[in-house]
């Protein structure tokens, strides 16, 4: 059974810059003007990452544009946003990202079937330059293979 997801924003660079070892879903605490702006698709999570502050996890550098029709009650575009996770999940995440070289990266932001905003997070390890070159070579080779198959 496939889940309904209306994708708002994706972080395509994360798949190039990191090895994604584990994926998880988290809710996010938002203000009303932020939700309205997300419904218009005005969000970017290209540079966003998550970090722990004690017993909580926050999403940093997530840009949600201001909602034009909200007057003085508008939100700050790049404020830290709290992620909603179970305590066991938070402890597991903190244990994993405290290891050197690991980070918590936002992969996508979407509305689920109940119209709640969710963030897909990935526990990731950074790629070295030669790893990035290898992934480019693999992608080019797959593209060439598909061209050769189509020509036959």
From Swiss-Prot:
Keywords: Cytoplasm, RNA-binding. It holds the Pfam family SmpB. It is found in: Cytoplasm. GO terms for molecular function: RNA binding. Gene3D superfamilies: 2.40.280.10. One of its GO terms (cellular component) is cytosol. Required for rescue of stalled ribosomes mediated by trans-translation. Binds to transfer-messenger RNA (tmRNA), required for stable association of tmRNA with ribosomes. tmRNA and SmpB together mimic tRNA shape, replacing the anticodon stem-loop with SmpB. tmRNA is encoded by the ssrA gene; the 2 termini fold to resemble tRNA(Ala) and it encodes a 'tag peptide', a short internal open reading frame. During trans-translation Ala-aminoacylated tmRNA acts like a tRNA, entering the A-site of stalled ribosomes, displacing the stalled mRNA. PANTHER family: SSRA-BINDING PROTEIN, TMRNA-BINDING COMPONENT OF TRANS-TRANSLATION TAGGING COMPLEX. Belongs to the SmpB family. This is SsrA-binding protein. The gene is smpB.
């Amino acid at each position: 059974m496939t889940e309904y997801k209306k994708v708002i924003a994706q972080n395509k660079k994360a798949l190039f810059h990191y090895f994604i070892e584990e994926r998880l879903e988290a809710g996010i605490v938002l203000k009303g003007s932020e939700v309205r702006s997300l419904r218009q698709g005005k969000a970017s999570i290209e540079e966003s990452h998550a970090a722990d502050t004690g017993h909580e996890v926050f999403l940093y550098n997530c840009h949600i544009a201001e909602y034009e029709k909200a007057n003085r009650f508008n939100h700050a575009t790049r404020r830290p946003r709290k992620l909603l996770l179970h305590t066991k999940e938070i402890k597991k995440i903190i244990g994993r990202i405290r290891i050197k070289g690991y980070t918590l990266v936002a992969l996508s932001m979407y509305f689920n079937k109940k119209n709640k905003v969710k963030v897909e997070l990935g526990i990731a390890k950074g790629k070295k330059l030669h790893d990035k070159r290898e992934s480019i070579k693999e992608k080019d080779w797959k593209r060439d293979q598909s061209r050769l198959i189509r020509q036959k």
